[in-house]
Design a protein with these regions (language model features):
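Short coil turns linking two alpha-helices in DNA-binding domains
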Residues: 79-80
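Short helix-coil-helix linker/hinge
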Residues: 44-47
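Non-DNA-binding regulatory cores of transcription-related proteins
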Residues: 92-169
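Basic amphipathic alpha-helical segments that dock to polyanions
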Residues: 83-93
Length: 169
């Protein structure tokens, strides 16, 4: 499953194209993460940077155990608690999102701003795209507030078929 880097794709199609500059996305994400962590006064350790890089390298929602397999460790692969703590940090800092329905993580396309995570997940090609919609985000906040609920976190996952897969049907 792939996740699109929204700033590099046409707004009308948030899913990645074959000609998409994947290496550029990884470089941009790591550079932006380093700058954000420095401004926020938190450390982007080598392990945190490497886990973030693994998440972005695949452009796919990636599970914690897949990350563990790809992390070289001094005595084999990294331990599950280490990877989960690292992913918790990256989520707290808004550098990655957890897609609950897939039990996987993706790089955040807009880590500089607090926002609600909205994902389109194609059941055909298994690609996923993070989208940003202020109207939908505002609606979520209004519904929560009307119920007297203090919304802290929201992830919306919409499953269907992307334009490419609908065209093949």
């Amino acid at each position: 499953m792939k996740t699109a880097h929204a700033s590099r794709l046409p707004a009308s199609d948030p899913f990645p194209l074959a000609s998409h500059d994947h290496a550029g996305c990884v470089r941009d994400a790591l550079s932006q993460a380093a700058a954000l962590c420095e401004r926020r006064g938190v450390r982007l350790t080598e392990l945190r940077r490497r886990v973030l890089e693994i998440v972005w390298e695949s452009h796919s929602p990636v599970g914690a155990y897949e990350i563990m397999e790809r992390l070289p460790g001094e005595r084999g692969r990294a331990a599950p608690p280490t990877v989960y703590r690292t992913l918790d940090f990256l989520c707290r800092e808004g550098l990655v999102h957890r897609i609950d329905s897939l039990n996987a993580f993706v790089g955040c396309t807009a880590p500089e701003a607090l926002h609600r995570a909205l994902f389109l997940i194609c059941r055909g090609c298994r690609n996923a795209a993070e989208i940003h919609d202020g109207t939908l985000e505002g609606s979520l906040e209004r519904v929560a507030a009307a119920a007297g609920f203090g919304l802290e976190r929201a992830t919306v996952e919409l499953t269907g078929l992307c334009a490419h897969c609908r065209g093949r049907a």
